[in-house]
């Protein structure tokens, strides 16, 4: 499975979302190609809150206390972006989605926004959620050792509906936030494999990184993911079987 051509180095404990601990500043940005009803945005915002509470509860299982501070743009007045490209889970998604939005909001770019956060928000970590009112496949942009400095700011691009048109679950939000903190996918994707999917089905069938569920409380943060996101420092060699191609030399 190793593909040295897309090796990016480790994504664990690096970037604006280093470890799932302490206080996390979560900036949500609502964008769409046309005006989007406030009530519908609030319906999705409640899913974000449900995902946050689930993360708090799961961290507590590992003996960690976390909290969230929320920021928001676009809730009252939608940020209109024409011709938004949707995620498709191919690895060819747009990775420069955050900076143009932050510039539109008055910042000079990703790093300028991070300086503002450090100066104005009492927090340990920061994640930006871009919520787009369009069907597609959500994805996260987690910082790695070999990615450009501006990608230090970690973010998620969240679709309100799956490609099928079905409304997205809170579990999808929690899944992508975990990616920002270094979690690996535990199912078959462009950078993993069927073998990883098989092992996860056997050992971690209810992992948030392996599958989704309409009821997020049926899912857990498994031991591999707990190590990846910093809820535990315990590492077993077995965990390395789940490493994606981007973190295998």
What is the role of each PLM region?
Residues 154-174:
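Short pre-active-site segment immediately N-terminal to the catalytic Zn-binding motif
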Residues 25-28, 127-131, 156-157, 179-180, ...:
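Structural recognition of the beta-strand scaffold that forms the well-ordered cores
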Residues 171, 176-194:
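Catalytic Zn2+-binding segment of zinc metalloproteases
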Residues 1-123:
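Propeptide-to-catalytic entry region of secreted or membrane-anchored zinc metalloproteases
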Residues 40, 44-47, 94, 113, ...:
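Stable alpha-helical elements in mature extracytoplasmic
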């Amino acid at each position: 499975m190793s593909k040295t051509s897309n090796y990016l180095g480790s994504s664990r404990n690096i970037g604006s979302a280093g470890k799932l601990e302490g206080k996390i500043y979560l900036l949500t940005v609502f964008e769409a190609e046309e005006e989007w009803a406030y009530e519908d945005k609030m319906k999705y915002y409640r899913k974000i809150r449900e995902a946050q509470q689930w993360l708090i509860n799961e961290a507590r299982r590992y003996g960690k206390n976390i909290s969230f501070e929320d920021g928001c743009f676009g809730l009252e007045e939608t940020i209109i972006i024409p011709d938004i490209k949707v995620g498709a889970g191919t690895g060819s998604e747009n990775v420069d989605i955050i900076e143009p939005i932050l510039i539109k909001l008055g910042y000079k770019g990703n790093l300028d926004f991070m300086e503002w956060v450090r100066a104005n928000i009492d927090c340990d970590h920061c994640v930006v959620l871009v919520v787009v009112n369009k069907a597609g496949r959500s994805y996260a942009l987690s910082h790695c050792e070999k990615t450009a400095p501006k990608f230090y700011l970690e973010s998620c691009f969240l679709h309100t509906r799956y490609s099928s048109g079905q409304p997205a679950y809170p579990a999808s939000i929690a899944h992508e936030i975990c990616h920002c903190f270094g979690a690996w996918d535990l199912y078959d994707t462009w950078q993993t494999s069927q073998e990883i999917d098989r092992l996860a089905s056997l050992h971690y069938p209810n992992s948030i990184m392996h599958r989704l569920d309409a009821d997020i409380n049926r899912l857990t943060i498994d031991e591999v993911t707990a190590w990846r996101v910093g809820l535990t420092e315990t590492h077993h060699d077995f965990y390395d079987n789940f490493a994606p191609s981007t973190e295998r030399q």
